[in-house]
């Protein structure tokens, strides 16, 4: 008998130890018997499920797990699609009773100091909010009665003081509790009144922005606070220029080192933010972050990281603020007669050439034939390449386009007209790069080039400072990011990329702005 009792005692102790190592949250939600309740955590604006339980006929159930839940703000999600928040800290064995009629009023907590102080503070705020609303209505009714207005304002002020005192007491009494740290994280930094200059106030605010919000405190990622806090800093407090943003992003990412969860979130968040951003400067940030940190992304596959590295290597060649790669092209003649003289040679190309396939054993020989035929063709455009870098101009607009593109058909005539009327008057030259089809299919290339000829002739796209360019061997597809047509790049006189992937009208506005800034600088 003693042995049996001993075994039962040991079993009970081991069960208790197992429970202490994991979580056991007993719930009773009135009015939803035999229904499902979800336990989950906040992750910025998302609700992430962690566990489910089906309540019994008494509306009771237990969430159990062998591993402890990470500290943070959690929720209980009900079949009505309503939910109420709870906190998970180090002590994860407790009970919660509630009623669907009023979550805050009917909440009962047993065994969790964290949730009790959370609930008490919520009640205080709720009561203060109701009082404040009543006083606001009374203040409106008391307009014109100065004594009454002042009396009401004092009462409103006392409410704020009461809430502030509750916060200070909470922080002093439970300094190491998650809820105290969460409350502190919700509070904005206060700029000392002694700092009166607005610029100084801004820089103080920025320098101390994260004082109440430690970026390396992992539980904050399981709240609604983390991402909005970072977004506000990046969007509102940082200079929106590539070099500044790169520096700020590095600071944010490095602040999270030492915690894999935070490091992964911060890197992924900033990487995706600038990968999707349509601002032409955003790509500089995306490329820099990917180049530095991609190899550290232990959670990504090698194939994914390899693909990212290839994209980064390509985009490095065409970043705004960086020198562009040169374009070595052949120029289409500037009159219809000489263009028509080229048509027999593209007909000959079609007759001589045949489609080639890499799988065929004679691929290399046929590829050599392709090169010979294309060399013969482009030599009839002229025997020397035109270097875009070597053409002197204050501004150089490079547009990649093709005659089958419906948007190109609309934009290219407009661009040519705008060039003749406006762009050429401010020292801008245009390099219209024809994007040919695959050189492995001469039939398709023949058809496509004829369309190019037809379009240029019909629109009479001939003018001094306007260059119609072509070169099937040029590596522009590797050196310029052209995922759609037409795509515009704007270079300065030193061939540095100053804008890309915006309309030619926007580029014109930028050129005007730069010219005006230059004139102002001269006048100083």
Regions found by a protein language model. Give the residues of each.
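Thiol/disulfide oxidoreductase modules built on the thioredoxin-like
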Residues: 186, 471-515
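Structural microenvironment flanking redox-active thiols in thiol-disulfide oxidoreductases
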Residues: 409-458, 473-477
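Coil residues (strongly favoring Ser/Thr
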Residues: 36, 51-52, 100, 244, ...
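N-terminal targeting signals for export/organelle localization
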Residues: 243-371, 523-524
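Bacterial Sec-dependent N-terminal signal peptides
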Residues: 1-28, 434, 500, 517-524
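Short active-site neighborhood of thiol/selenol oxidoreductases, capturing the structured segment around
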Residues: 344-352, 357-365, 371-416, 429-433
């Amino acid at each position: 008998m003693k042995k049996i009792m001993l075994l039962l005692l040991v079993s009970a102790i081991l069960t208790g130890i197992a429970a202490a190592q994991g979580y056991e949250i007993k719930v009773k939600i009135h009015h939803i018997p035999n229904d499902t309740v979800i336990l989950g955590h906040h992750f910025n604006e998302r609700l992430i499920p962690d566990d489910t339980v089906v309540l019994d006929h008494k509306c009771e159930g237990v969430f159990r797990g062998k591993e402890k839940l990470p500290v943070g703000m959690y929720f209980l999600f009900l079949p009505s699609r309503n939910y109420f928040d709870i906190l998970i800290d180090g002590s994860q064995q407790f009970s919660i009773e509630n009623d669907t009629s009023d979550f805050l009023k009917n909440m009962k907590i047993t065994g969790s100091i964290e949730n009790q102080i959370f609930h008490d503070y919520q009640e205080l705020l709720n009561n203060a909010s109701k009082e404040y609303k009543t006083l606001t209505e009374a203040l409106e009714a008391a307009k014109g009665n100065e004594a009454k207005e002042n009396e009401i304002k004092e009462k409103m002020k006392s409410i704020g003081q009461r809430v502030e005192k509750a916060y200070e007491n909470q922080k002093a009494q439970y300094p190491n509790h998650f809820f105290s740290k969460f409350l502190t994280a919700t509070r904005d930094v206060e700029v000392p009144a002694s700092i009166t200059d607005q610029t100084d106030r801004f820089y103080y605010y920025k320098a101390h922005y994260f004082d109440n919000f430690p970026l390396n405190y992992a539980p904050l990622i399981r709240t609604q606070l983390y991402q909005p806090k970072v977004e506000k800093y990046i969007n509102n407090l940082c200079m929106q220029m590539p070099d500044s943003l790169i520096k700020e992003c590095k600071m944010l990412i490095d602040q999270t080192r030492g915690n894999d969860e935070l490091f992964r979130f911060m890197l992924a968040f900033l990487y995706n933010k600038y990968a999707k951003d349509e601002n032409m400067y955003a790509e500089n940030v995306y490329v820099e972050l990917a180049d530095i940190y991609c190899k550290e992304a232990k959670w990504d596959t090698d194939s994914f990281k390899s693909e990212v590295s290839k994209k980064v290597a390509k985009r490095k060649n065409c970043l705004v603020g960086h020198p562009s790669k040169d374009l070595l092209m052949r120029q289409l003649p500037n009159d219809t007669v000489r263009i028509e003289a080229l048509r027999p040679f593209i007909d000959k190309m079609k007759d001589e050439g045949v489609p080639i396939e890499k799988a065929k054993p004679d691929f290399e020989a046929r590829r050599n034939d392709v090169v010979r035929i294309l060399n013969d063709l482009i030599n009839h455009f002229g025997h020397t390449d035109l270097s875009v870098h070597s053409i002197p101009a204050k501004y150089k607009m490079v547009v990649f386009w093709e005659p089958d593109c419906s948007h190109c058909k609309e934009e290219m005539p407009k661009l040519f007209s705008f060039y003749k009327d406006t762009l050429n008057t401010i020292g801008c030259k245009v390099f219209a790069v024809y994007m040919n089809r695959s050189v492995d299919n001469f039939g398709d290339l023949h058809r496509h080039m004829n369309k190019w000829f037809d379009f240029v002739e019909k629109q009479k796209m001939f003018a001094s400072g306007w260059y119609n360019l072509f070169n099937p061997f040029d590596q522009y597809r590797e050196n310029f990011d052209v995922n759609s047509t037409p795509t515009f790049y704007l270079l300065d006189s030193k061939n540095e990329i100053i804008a890309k992937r915006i309309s030619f009208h926007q580029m014109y506005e930028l050129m005007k702005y730069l010219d005006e800034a230059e004139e102002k600088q001269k006048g100083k």
